[in-house]
């Protein structure tokens, strides 16, 4: 099974560069604006798009992403509407991989089998479910693989060599290395430490390793991209979105461009990385 994610990383390897991976909350600040932003991301340079599924108890998310989830939920975003948004995105974009990121509870309530069928039909390529450990692979990870979806696992600075094989056992698509301990958006990533961590993970897997948490600028994105297979940026894009909203938290004429312009600057940082390393 070759997925869009596999194809994208193969293309990037030929180009000699790392991936620029964006994260935004689905439905933030409202479903229509969210779709317009996501449609603008490939042109801005996003190689892979992660879309958050809003949830009422997002334990791994920092304040910015939690606020994004609240805005999305208040605007009526649901799992069904998130999948519909991806379906609408796919009408005009067939090659950029889309990864859904979230928590198990909304998927469980929706129904695992139905969710996987509907996600695949909508054009989803992979899942990141932050609160399902490898010991629970039979719940969602293995069914997702059977449905043709990549299941992307998180590794952290505290994931030691003893634990890594279990974390990586059924992982596919790529490994998402969380470069700092704590919640999203809480600190800056240390690119030197990241390089050592990526090398350690690669001793256990042939999968690409993307690095997220703490990347806010083009320079930081370049530093991470030089030491990994991809730089994931979320909180900085969410902050750009929230900074463009009006006093009521509603979208303005600036909202789509605020996110797309920052994405383009970050993408340029990532794309300059391999040239600098050569």
From Swiss-Prot:
It holds the Pfam family Trp_syntA. It catalyses: (1S,2R)-1-C-(indol-3-yl)glycerol 3-phosphate + L-serine = D-glyceraldehyde 3-phosphate + L-tryptophan + H2O. InterPro entries: Aldolase_TIM, RibuloseP-bd_barrel, Trp_synthase_alpha_AS, Trp_synthase_suA. Pathway: Amino-acid biosynthesis; L-tryptophan biosynthesis; L-tryptophan from chorismate: step 5/5. Its EC number is 4.2.1.20. Tetramer of two alpha and two beta chains. NCBIfam families: trpA. One of its GO terms (molecular function) is tryptophan synthase activity. The keyword Iron-sulfur does not apply. GO terms for cellular component: cytosol. The lineage of its organism: Bacteria, Pseudomonadati, Pseudomonadota, Alphaproteobacteria, Hyphomicrobiales. PROSITE patterns: TRP_SYNTHASE_ALPHA (PS00167). This is Tryptophan synthase alpha chain. It is an enzyme of class 4 (lyase). HAMAP family: Trp_synth_alpha (MF_00131). The active site is at residues 50, 61. Belongs to the TrpA family. The alpha subunit is responsible for the aldol cleavage of indoleglycerol phosphate to indole and glyceraldehyde 3-phosphate. Gene3D superfamilies: Aldolase class I. The keyword Amino-acid biosynthesis applies. Keywords: Amino-acid biosynthesis, Aromatic amino acid biosynthesis, Lyase, Tryptophan biosynthesis.
């Amino acid at each position: 099974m070759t997925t869009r994610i596999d194809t994208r990383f193969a293309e990037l390897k030929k180009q000699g560069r790392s991936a620029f991976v964006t994260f935004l909350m689905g439905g933030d600040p409202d479903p229509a604006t969210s779709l317009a932003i996501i449609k603008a991301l490939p042109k801005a340079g996003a190689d892979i798009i992660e879309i958050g599924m809003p949830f009422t108890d997002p334990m791994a998310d920092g304040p910015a992403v939690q606020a994004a989830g609240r805005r999305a939920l208040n605007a009526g975003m649901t799992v069904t509407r998130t999948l519909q948004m991806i379906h609408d995105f796919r009408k005009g974009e067939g090659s950029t991989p889309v990864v859904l990121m979230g928590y198990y509870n909304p998927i469980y309530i929706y129904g695992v089998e139905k969710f996987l069928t509907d996600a695949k039909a909508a054009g989803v390529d992979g899942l990141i479910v932050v609160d399902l450990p490898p010991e629970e692979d039979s719940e969602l990870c293995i069914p997702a693989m059977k449905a043709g979806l990549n299941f992307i696992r998180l590794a952290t600075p505290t994931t030691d060599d003893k634990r890594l094989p279990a974390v990586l056992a059924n992982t596919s698509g790529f490994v998402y290395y969380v470069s700092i301990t704590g919640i999203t958006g809480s600190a800056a990533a240390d690119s030197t430490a990241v390089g050592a961590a990526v090398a350690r993970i690669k001793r256990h897997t042939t999968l690409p390793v993307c690095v997220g948490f703490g990347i806010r600028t083009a320079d930081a994105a370049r530093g991470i991209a030089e030491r990994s297979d991809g730089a994931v940026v979320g909180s900085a894009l969410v902050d750009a979105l929230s900074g463009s909203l009006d006093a009521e938290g509603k979208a303005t004429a600036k909202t789509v461009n605020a996110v797309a312009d920052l994405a383009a600057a970050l993408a340029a940082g990532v794309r300059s990385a391999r040239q600098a390393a050569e």
